[in-house]
Amino acid sequence: MGVPSFYRWLAEKYPLLVADVIEEEPVEIEGIKIPVDTSKPNPNNLEYDNLYLDMNGIIHPCFHPEDRPSPTTFEEVFQCMFDYIDRLFVMVRPRKLLYMAIDGVAPRAKMNQQRSRRFRSAKDASDAAAEEERLREEFEREGRRLPPKVDSQVFDSNVITPGTEFMGVLSIALQYYVHLRLNHDVGWKNIKVILSDANVPGEGEHKIMSYIRLQRNLPGFDPNTRHCLYGLDADLIMLGLATHEVHFSILREVVYTPGQQERCFLCGQMGHFASNCEGKPKKRAGESDEKGDGNDFVKKPYQFLHIWVLREYLELEMRIPNPPFEIDLERIVDDFIFICFFVGNDFLPHMPTLEIREGAINLLMAVYKKEFRSFDGYLTDGCKPNLKRVEQFIQAVGSFEDKIFQKRAMQHQRQAERVKRDKAGKATKRMDDEAPTVQPDLVPVARFSGSRLASAPTPSPFQSNDGRSAPHQKVRRLSPGSSVGAAIVDVENSLESDERENKEELKTKLKELIREKSDAFNSDTTEEDKVKLGQPGWRERYYEEKFSVVTPEEMERVRKDVVLKYTEGLCWVMHYYMEGVCSWQWFYPYHYAPFASDLKDLGEMDIKFELGTPFKPFNQLLGVFPAASSHALPERYRTLMTDPNSPIIDFYPTDFEVDMNGKRFSWQGIAKLPFIDERRLLEAVSEVEFTLTDEEKRRNSRMCDMLFIATSHRLAELVFSLDNHCRQLSARERVDFKVKIKPKLSDGMNGYLTPCSGETHPPVFRSPMEGMEDILTNQVICCIYRLPDAHEHITRPPPGVIFPKKTVDIGDLKPPPALWHEDNGRRPMHNNHGMHNNHGMHNNQGRQNPPGSVSGRHLGNAAHRLVSNSLQMGTDRYQTPTDVPAPGYGYNPPQYVPPIPYQHGGYMAPPGAQGYAQPAPYQNRGGYQPRGPSGRFPSEPYQSQSREGQHASRGGGYSGNHQNQHQQQQWHGQGGSEQNNPRGYNGQHHHQQGGDHDRRGRGRGSHHHHDQGGNPRHRY
């Protein structure tokens, strides 16, 4: 799933989802920086219990930080990470738990994608190095000095993979960081910290989800636990939905489209508005003010994405016209998660039919709502897709393929022609601009009353006729009384400044060249499109070109196998999101996906999985690394990747085909690498594994999560008693011994504790980094944490949950867009009412609202932000803060008129209505209400009104107060009619909306089956 594209689609379609983070900054007093006191209330009026960090979303940015120079050592990366975590902690301020999860060994299904990424990364790095060397030679010929290359420990980002030396040292550095904060930061004193490092199998975000799922519905669990998850992957949103935890937020950096980020319109720089612009030129990397520290970079802002608001949007957006039975929102949420897998995920190749940028999710949602009545039930039941219904759904989507491919081909042709015209125009302009010119001095001009004058910078040395004489010119400008030593220092400083400028110019040119080369439209030898989607015969040509089939019989055989494996993948992914890994060995064995219309006869498939075991870290490195990254492996393992006589040398091609597959940029292409043969790989490893040192064996082993708490924590007594009990046990006996956690001592956390292999409470904790202090009076203890015993994940909110007050109503929904393949950009006529759009929305003048336009409250909010940014965020001429409360609306909001059901399933504003409904004065639109003295949320009941064409909704639309017969749904997709039997609990439970709504439901037993070897077997 595209990282920015899905998040951007969601934030634009549902704007109330996101809220900007209010960030409190450290203050500096007499040169001493005073950190933020995180024990104080959160300025965002949101108090969170647990903060979860998907650490790979922190490690990768710290290899290439935007707020400081690029690091060259591991220690610089670690320091950047510490600052990064500190900043996130200040934003969220968890009160019970901080969970840091680093990616461990991934399931085999993910390793194919990891292999492709790492091979591409190595190839791109090689190409960039060659291009940089060419540019350096060009600069030297022109006499332009460059600083020498600096040796770097972090030259290869592929080392961010389990089993490498970097990941081993990182674990130690994070343990030190946790000890440092628990010992000295008052905001950390009462929290538990769990560190799941790279030696614990599983992707970071899925280790977090396993923790959340297995805490639910156990004794002592608080159903109103408030979760916040940080990470950069778009699938975190789906994972948050899949927990069915209501009080859940995703924290991430703001995603900008090019040109979208707010800049000062005077100087064009980010980080401030015109009202407080100082007219300073943009700083280059490495430059700083005389008294500055050189770290004056713009920090990216952050946003919360609230899952409970997304649930409210989905309840309204996914309403079914004239439903055949009462709709269960929890089942709708699960179906939404499932249908979004078709637009992309990390485990299956991209289906050629659907593109997010072409409105694919809108199409999937429209088809789902239109076809729902004919499904006779939901597409999924927990982690189990009903394949018969899935086939019916995806066939309806596939019926649009011809139109989609035809429009895509037409737009691709237009885009290619436009790029060629632009390219020709730029070439002409370059020829006109070849004559050398000298830029005149800029004249100081007053911007506005009370502002500073814009300084007129002197021309750079290379704005003169001969850049190489610049240093001598600067010597001649020295005053007669200046000393020779001062002149030498001045020249040296000038040379260093020139080198920095040249280095920045080289980096800029390098980025431009790499981007130009990655653009297929800039290539003189454009790859021929042999498939020609949209032209008759596209299906046959697709299988001939992508799967190398020749005869019709072979094509049909391959098509059936591709469909089977792809359907297995859909079932595997759904289980992974809802319950966890159902097979460590399964993977999709093709580079390409089938068409939507190819997914037939799904109900006849008998799909099974065997759990198996994860790879060892070094085995995964052999499976995903190119030979260029072999330096990160032990010596004998390297030879398996580089020796021409290696039995698996064919796994490591130095050159490989990248199929552009109709895409524009090379990074969008498909790397056609050979798939790893697990049997051959393990046989080769068995010949070298005995050569590992003790340290290498440790890096190659499977370990457990570590729990850290202060000695003052209520759980500390249990940890000390555990350590005393196990002192006389052998290492093997210590690993096997465990004691159950008492939830009342751990803020409701369940699980088991095991003594760690080292000291539980070392009196001194040495710093693994130069320049950082040792902890001489350590007051932190450590032990191993084990998850609670596996139990079924019940996919609905737990008993006793209190739903936040509603923040979204029908007026907050944007009109449903025209389907991409049907939208010709023209305004359609509708009967005799003048211009009318496709969404059932029109205004009194009969004119269509332009696509993407806003109105009503959204327009008012946008105008208010514009005024605030321009006038209220700076200081006046006397340096007096101008922040004032925002004015109220300057008009009386129009009376709200309920929308009328439109014949095509949407809603339209009735005659006389003016935009969207205005919120009631008491209505909170920022998420949680402030907590009262009792520590609970206000208990104001909410009940939505039943409307024609929309199901009645109380307490979020959860139905559980009725009972229906439910025919057992089979895993192979032959389920019978389903009349909304909500999956729930054995016995009764309560859902509370504002504290006074009761819900009841019935549960079923476990569906797990086991083979004779003890491994769970999952069957669809």
Curated annotation (Swiss-Prot):
Low complexity: bias regions: 831-844, 911-923, 960-972
* InterPro entries referenced in this protein's UniProt entry, alphabetically: 5_3_exoribonuclease, Xrn1_helical, Xrn1_N, Xrn2/3/4, Znf_CCHC, Znf_CCHC_sf
**GO molecular function (one):** zinc ion binding
| One GO BP annotation of this record | nuclear polyadenylation-dependent rRNA catabolic process
In this entry, which stretches build a coiled coil? 487-523
Zinc finger feature spans (CCHC-type): 262-279
Q: Composition bias, kind Basic residues: at what positions?
A: 1000-1020
What does this protein's UniProt record list under function?
A: Possesses 5'->3' exoribonuclease activity. Acts as an endogenous post-transcriptional gene silencing (PTGS) suppressor. Degrades miRNA-derived loops, excised during miRNA maturation in the nucleus. Required for proper development. Involved in pre-rRNA processing. Involved with XRN2 in the 5'-end exonucleolytic processing of 5.8S and 25S rRNAs. Contributes with XRN2 to polyadenylation-dependent nuclear RNA surveillance. Involved in the degradation of aberrant polyadenylated pre-rRNA through 5'-end processing.
Q: What is this protein called?
A: 5'-3' exoribonuclease 3
Organism phylogeny: Eukaryota, Viridiplantae, Streptophyta, Embryophyta, Tracheophyta
Point out the gene that encodes the protein.
XRN3
